[in-house]
Design a protein with these regions (language model features):
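Structured, helix-rich domain cores that form ligand/interaction pockets
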Residues: 1-217
Length: 217
């Protein structure tokens, strides 16, 4: 791609940049799916999940035909800073960890300015004064409108979603006992006790349309 063409391609991706997304809504997230022009990646081997070797970097691949690369990261990529969740203060640190631990070489500055977020799990934690299971049991039992679907999430938790078949207009709201989830997955990134009596609330948005609608950007 020529330099002029590359600049046009970069400019066409100035939609949901990390600074504008994070700073304007002050969000914290447990997961981000990002796509960006290939020029944001100095070196990008195509990894299968089991080959990556970095907790929190779930997948990473390049599409030469579309001149784009795609990556999905979760809060685990923060290492000992896992309890912070992904946010505007640590996203640069998260991307730099990819450079330092894997064979991937990102142009972090370009990626922060031109990377587009195509999926986000907006996350918050609610610290309770009693057993979270009492709260979650109530949510599993109360009447809800017909247009909302309620399903179990790992038995003890609950997920609400819309019935809309078009994922561009669908949302998932999941509430679960974070302490139990940490114990179940044996997360090495943090101490279990940090999440005792915590209900985690995650809003899963899978499209640019939903991100713009719910995050008011």
């Amino acid at each position: 791609m020529t330099k002029q063409g590359d600049e046009r391609h970069l400019n066409s991706n100035r939609r949901l940049r990390f600074p504008s997304l994070s700073e304007r809504v002050g969000l914290t997230a447990d997961l981000l799916r990002i796509h960006a022009p290939l020029s944001c990646f100095k070196e990008i081997p195509n990894y299968r999940k089991e080959e990556i070797g970095l907790p929190g970097l779930t997948y990473l691949y390049a599409n030469e035909n579309r001149q784009k690369a795609y990556l999905l990261i979760t809060s685990e990529i923060l290492g000992k800073r896992y309890p912070e969740k992904l946010n505007c203060e640590n996203i640069e640190y998260a991307l730099e960890r990819i450079n330092s631990i894997t064979d991937v070489e990102l142009d972090v500055e370009l990626l922060l300015n031109y990377g587009c977020v195509s999926e986000v799990h907006v996350t918050d934690d609610l610290l309770l004064s009693h057993d979270p299971q009492i709260y979650l049991y109530a949510l599993r039992s109360i009447p809800i409108p017909d247009k909302i679907n309620r399903t179990p999430y790992h038995k003890e938790s609950v997920r609400f979603s819309t019935y809309n078949k078009d994922k561009r207009h669908r949302f998932y709201l999941t509430l679960y006992d974070k302490y139990r989830e940490i114990k179940r997955h044996r997360c090495r990134q943090c101490e279990d006790e940090l999440f005792r009596d915590v209900v985690r609330i995650e809003l899963k948005l899978e499209s640019a349309e939903m991100i713009k609608k719910y995050l008011k950007i």
